[in-house]
Amino acid sequence: MNASVAIQVLPKVEGEELIGIVDEVIAYIKSTGLNMSVGPFETTIEGDYDELMDIVKECQKICIDKGAPSVMAYVKINYNPKGIWTIEKKIKKHHLEIK
């Protein structure tokens, strides 16, 4: 694993339709089988750089295929050929179980 990507898609649609399209994008990302984390503003995915770039492209295509006339995608990329810190390593200490 040499990269992580945080992606936020904003399809140009009105109201609740936005949530439905974003849900479709998240379902697609889940279907890739890669380690991922859904947040309130973006979804983070870990994997191989080239595979992640293909996923970013597909996320935008899904928005269009689901009826959005256009889509804005905000993408953050962390790439290191030698490997990256995992999502778990970065956030585990902030998500301790409440007892």
Residue ranges and their predicted role:
Residues 1-99:
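Charge-rich, low-complexity N-terminal segments
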